[in-house]
From Swiss-Prot:
GO CC annotation terms, alphabetical: cytoplasm
Gene that this polypeptide is encoded by: hemH
Subcellular location: Cytoplasm
Binding site for Fe cation: 189, 293
Record-linked HAMAP family: Ferrochelatase (MF_00323)
Main location: cytoplasm
Catalysed reactions listed for this entry: heme b + 2 H(+) = protoporphyrin IX + Fe(2+)
Protein name: Ferrochelatase
Family membership: Belongs to the ferrochelatase family.
One GO MF term: metal ion binding
Natural source organism: Pseudomonas putida (strain W619)
Record Pfam families: Ferrochelatase
Keywords (A to Z) from UniProt: Cytoplasm, Heme biosynthesis, Iron, Lyase, Metal-binding, Porphyrin biosynthesis
UniProt-listed Enzyme Commission number(s): 4.98.1.1
Any one of the GO BP annotations: heme biosynthetic process
Length: 337
């Protein structure tokens, strides 16, 4: 075994569906300044208020989608890890979570102790955001520096418009899209508008435009999460040959009262049902592995909302997970990182 490891990093999950474990996980997640970007005292107060009721609510949601093997996100990321071993001859393939276990700092320490000297760090997020990519890279660099680990890090960059990533989406989703359906909704995880605006100070970038990055500079496109989501969706629809009007984009998982990027998924579900859509397909391309946001928020609550609004069937298209084409594509992208 050589000294070059591949480290696949995903968001994370509570250790169990107990309220205590969910509270611990939510506290770690929400206290990350890249997630809740407020001054520490304000962030601590806000998170403390959220943790009064949210852990019990979230524990119920996790319990509704929990597998016998554990958290779907962790289980699916481990399956991806197992498949990637055959495609990475340079050293060990490991996984880490930004929040929860296996914790990123401990995994880096273990790799260094095993004699690894190079690590290709693969944040499993197609689109760029501070709350996903930046926080992973920052924690990895901080860990290496503070613990004096003899590790050289390389980072897989966001791949939202990489042709092979789009091909993997097509290969994974094609069996569902070859069936009859009325509309395809591509639902991405949402972000507060301020997360994007602070990355483009002085820019007149319109985050509510139908194509917000149409005339944007390369610097703005590199940090505009919304524009990258729209680009992923457009590339996928074009590659699949889905006509305009039969697909649309929305953003889910809004938390709090701040303005988030639009349109909101819950709004689109009602609009599509009332417009006459009976069978709705929903894809969530911001996630490469199914998780609470896909299985519970869309697959359960979203389906219930759509049917109550007049629709008849909502089909959740699985994420890439450990699809063979995705495994091959990810391996090639990591080789070139």
């Amino acid at each position: 075994m050589t000294d070059h490891a591949l480290l696949l990093v995903n968001l994370g999950s509570p250790a169990s569906t107990s309220v205590a474990d969910v509270r611990r996980y939510l506290n770690q997640f929400l206290m990350d300044p890249y997630v809740v970007d407020l001054p520490w005292p304000v962030r601590r107060l806000l998170v403390s208020l959220i943790l009064i009721k949210r852990p019990e609510q979230s524990a119920h949601a996790y319990a509704s989608i929990w597998w016998d093997e554990g958290s779907p996100l962790v289980v699916l990321t481990r399956r991806l890890q197992a498949a990637m071993v055959e495609h990475w001859p340079h050293g060990p393939v490991e996984i880490a979570m930004r929040y929860g276990e296996p914790a990123l700092p401990q995994v880096l320490e273990r790799l260094a102790a095993q004699g690894v000297r190079k690590v290709t760090l693969a944040p499993l997020y197609p689109q760029f955001a501070d709350s996903t990519v930046t926080t992973v890279v920052a924690l990895a660099n901080q860990t290496v520096a503070e613990r004096a680990l003899p590790l050289q890090l390389r980072v897989l960059q966001p791949f939202y418009d990489h042709p092979e990533y789009i091909d993997a989406l097509v290969a994974s989703a094609r069996p569902y899209l070859e069936q009859d359906y009325d509309h395809l909704l591509l639902s991405f995880h949402g972000l507060p508008e301020r997360h994007l605006k602070k990355l483009m100070p002085g820019s007149k970038h319109d985050l509510r435009a139908a194509d917000c990055c149409k005339d944007a500079s390369a610097e703005v496109r590199a940090v505009c999460y919304r524009g990258q989501c729209l680009a992923s969706a457009k590339a996928f629809a074009t590659r699949m040959g889905i006509p305009d009007g039969k697909w649309s984009v929305s953003f889910q998982s809004r938390l709090g009262r701040d303005k988030w990027i639009e349109p909101y998924t819950e709004t689109r579900l009602d609009e599509l049902a009332k417009a006459g859509a009976k069978k709705l397909l929903v894809m969530c391309p911001a996630f490469v592995a199914d998780c609470i946001e896909t299985l519970e928020e869309i697959g359960d609550r979203g389906k219930e909302q759509f049917i109550e609004a007049g629709g008849e069937e909502l089909v959740l298209v699985p994420c890439l997970n450990d699809h063979p084409e995705w495994v091959r594509v990810l391996a090639r992208m990591c080789e070139k990182a």
